[in-house]
Amino acid sequence: MLEKVFDINQIFDEKGIMTLKRFGWDGSVAFQNHTDFSDELIDNAKKYGEENGILVYSGLKILSNNQNEIDKIVKKYRNRVEMIFIEGGDIKINRKTLESNETDVLSTPELNRADNGLDHVLTRLGSTNRVSIELNLSNLIKNKNYDRARVLWAFQRNLMLCKKYDTPVVISSGANDIYGIKAPDDVRGFLNTLVDQMYAKKIMETTSKIVNYRLHMKKSNVLMYGLEIVE
């Protein structure tokens, strides 16, 4: 039986959040791009979640090829959101993301590349720093013909590497409206075509575990992972 399963998307409206609940998701990480982040938008989404019995958390996706800028953005938002994603594709950004345990997810490492965006060295970095690799269904679906086959191949290659080196993996619908939302059973069914069922289950549960970890780290008595003030 699955533990809590959270989708990763850009759903902020009440109808969309109700659809996520109806489809069977326990929670949602609604991410905004760093260029247009709005506290009001995510606060309203969290309110809709409370009213409809589904957990809604805040995510931030960083879209930048400037490593110094990325550091500044992560520092600015780390305590304001539950998950930080960095859009990959550029091999230097892929490495930068996987070297930092202050980020949570390397998003689309294969973006605009002829290869999968990862190798053994980078995957080991993700394992060491517990940075997840994202499988973005929206990126897969929006591509066609050869490009879709290339993204699917990248998924398969990255899954093989991540399983070998115990690097966490998340899967996201990436939906920005109700038509892009997928039911968790359908998402797991897709994963079952790529990996064994137990590994698919592990991937489905990873997003909620990241959120729980970040919520724990925000507690005032937690100085660092494994070190807490006990009164």
From Swiss-Prot:
One of its GO terms (cellular component) is cytoplasm. Its main location: cytoplasm. Its EC number is 3.1.26.5. GO terms for biological process: tRNA 5'-leader removal. It is found in: Cytoplasm. Consists of a catalytic RNA component and at least 4-5 protein subunits. Belongs to the eukaryotic/archaeal RNase P protein component 3 family. This is Ribonuclease P protein component 3.
